[in-house]
Amino acid sequence: MKHVIMCFVTSLLLLLAIPMSAQQQSRLVSGVVKDESGEPMIGASILDTSTKQGTIADMDGKFSLEVTPSSKLHISFVGYKDQVISGKALKKDMIIVLKSNTEMIDELVVVGYGTQKKVNLTGAVASVSTSEIEGKPVTNLVEALQGTTSGLVIQQSNSAPGARPSINIRGLNTMNNNDPMVLIDGIIGDIQNVNPSDIENISVLKDASSTAIYGSRASNGVILITTKKGSAQKNEVTYEMQYGWQTPTCLPKVVDSWIYAEMRNEALINSGQPAAFTPEQIAYYRNGGPNCKWIEEIYKKNAPQQSHNLSFSGGNDKTTFLVSLGYMDQNSMFKGPDYGQQRYNGRLNLSHKVSDRFNFTTTVAYARNEVKDHAYWTEWIIEQATRMPAIYPIVDENGAYTFPSGSNSNALARLEQGGYRQNSNDDFSATLNAELKIWDGLKLKGMIGGQLYNNRTHENRKAIVAPASGDTENRMTEQFARSLNLTTNVMLTYDKSFGKHTIGAMVGYSYEGGSDKGYDTYRVTETSDFDIMVGTQTSNVGNSGSGSDWSIYSEFAR
C-alpha cells in the first residue's frame, strides 16, 4: 500500500513540475518591423504559430511577445512578403525588414480580350483564384462563387437539384435580363456546366470601363472563366472526392394538432360561432391521435450528394496537356422515385510550342446534365403541405393517401405517384487559339471556337387514382431545343517595356453567330388509371416550334 501511495505522489509531483518547467522556459522577445526604406510598419501582424498567440506592431513598428523554445513567429503585412523567425533568432530588440511583394504588383488579371497587370487596372475588376473555390461542398460553380468578391450577388431560389441560382453584378438591371455575360476560355458558355475542379482563374468585370469592350451585351457585367492547363515541370495524377448530406434546416413550424383544435375553437367562439372540436376530440389529439406535420412528411431526413474528379496533367518544354473527368450526383430532398441530378464532365486542354515564334492551344469540353424531378409545380406541393393542419394524417392506417375535406390533392401522393419530369442536356464546346510573334512585342493572335448545346425535357404527369383526388389528368410533354454558336476573332497586340514604363495596345475584329431551334408538344387524357397512352383523348393538345439565326460583327481596340 505504501508503494502505491509513493508512486501516486511521485507521479503528481512530476505532473506539477511540467507546467512549472514550461513557465520557466518561456521568455519575452521584442523588436521593430520596418520596410525596405526603414519606415515603421504600423499594424504589422506578429503571430506565434505554435501557441496561436499574437500581437500587432504599434505606431513605431515595435512589438513584444511571450515565446517558448518551440515558437515560430509569423510576421505579415498586406502587400509584403511574409517572414518566419524561430529558434535562436528569437531575441530582444530584433529588427525585422519586410520586403515588398512585387509579385502581387505584377500579378496578371484576365480582362476583356487579354490580361493586364493588377497595378495598371482602372476599372472595377475582381479576380477569383482556385484556392477560393476549391474544396467547397457545392454542386456547381455558381454556388462556389458565393462570398468570393464584393458586388457579386448570388441567390439560390430553391433547393431542387439542377436549380439555377441567379447571378447579379452590382444590383439588378431591367434590360432584357439580369444575367451577366459568361465567357469560358474565350467563348460564351453555360456556367452551370463547368466543373469547379477545372477552374484556374475567374475574373469578374463589374463596371462600364471594364465591360465596354464587349458592347451592350455586357451591360450586366462579365464573368471570364479560364480553365487549367498542363505544366511542363512534372506529370501529375489527381483524384478528388467529396461525400456529404443535405438536410432541411428551415421548415415552417406547424402547431400540434391539439393546439390547433384549441385555437380554432377560440377563434370561432370569439366570432360568435360554436366550437368545432369537443373536449374529447382535443384530448384524443393530445393522447396519441393524429399529429401529422405534412411539410415534414414530404422531405427526406437527409439527401446524400457526392462528386468525383480525376485529372491527368503534364508535358515537356514544347507540349503540355490536361485531361480531366468529373462526376457529380445529388439526390433530391423530396421523397419520390430517384429524384436528383447527375452531371458528367470531360475536358482536354492541349498547348504546343511549334517554334520560338509560333504556338497554339486547343480546348475540348463536354458536359452532360440529367435532372429528374416530380411532374408538378413545386410551389403547389409546398403550399398545400404548409397550410394543412396537423389534425389530418397524410396517409391513413392502411397506408392510403388521404384527401381531407376542402382539399382534393395530397402532396406526398403527387411526389410518389404523380409522375416525373426528366431534363437532359448535352454541352459540347471547343476552341483553337494561335499566337504568332511578328516582331519584338508585336503579336498576331487568332481564335476560333464553337458550342453545340442540346436540351430535351420529357414530362409524364400521372393522375392520382383516388375517390377524392382532383388530379385526374395525364399529361405528356416533350420539348427539345438546340443551339449552335460560332465565335472567331483576330487581334494584333503590342506590349513593350522601357525601364519602369510599359506601352500596351490592341486592335481586333470578331464574329459571333448562332442558330437556335426548338419544338414543344403536349397531350392530355382523362379517365385513365395509368398514363397518356391509355384513356380518353381531350382537346387539350398543343404543338409549337421556333427557329432563329443571329450574328454579330465587332471591331474593338484598347
Model-derived regions: residue spans:
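Proline-centered flexible-loop/turn and helix-kink motifs
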Residues: 145, 150, 389-390, 440
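Short, small/polar-rich motifs associated with maturation and membrane association
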Residues: 1-347, 359-361, 429, 521, ...
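Proline-rich low-complexity regions
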Residues: 40, 180-181, 389-390, 394, ...
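Charge-patterned, long linear interaction tracts outside catalytic cores
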Residues: 425, 431-438, 442-450
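Surface-exposed loop/interface segments of Gram-negative outer-membrane beta-barrel transport/assembly proteins
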Residues: 232-292, 332-427, 447-554
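Beta-sheet entry/capping signal
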Residues: 309, 320, 441-446, 504
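Outer-membrane beta-barrel strand-turn architecture
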Residues: 229, 315-318, 352-356, 436-440, ...
